[in-house]
Amino acid sequence: LHSTSRRQRQMCIRDRLASLIFCEAGNQPYEGQVAVGAVVMNRIKSSSYPDTMEEVIYQSGQFSPAMSGWLDRVRANQGYTEAAMQAAEDALAGSNPIGDCLYFSVGGYGTRIGDHLFH
């Protein structure tokens, strides 16, 4: 019973991250999708951000799909792609093409992957 609830919790975390990756980077190269997942994982590890994925993703003013409700709609319908799911799994397993970056944007500075700049 305990392992079932743990597995369900892990699936919930994976689905939440896959949904965010799809919303933020679904039209980007696979490496860019993993990089968005890595930003979330980096924030969880950072003392400057909350300690859980849910708190990081839904922190006020951080990820627009979380604020607009788009993320929740995608998640409710499992509307993310297989690539977004795989990117989430890879990021959760430690894949990180961006080092210690905590942000990404379409303008400004940083390491470019697809249309996003990671910094």
Language model segments and positions:
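Single conserved hydrophobic/aromatic residue that forms the stacking wall/gate
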Residues: L1-R9, I13
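Bacterial extracytoplasmic/cell-wall-associated proteins, especially those involved in peptidoglycan
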Residues: Q10, R14-H119
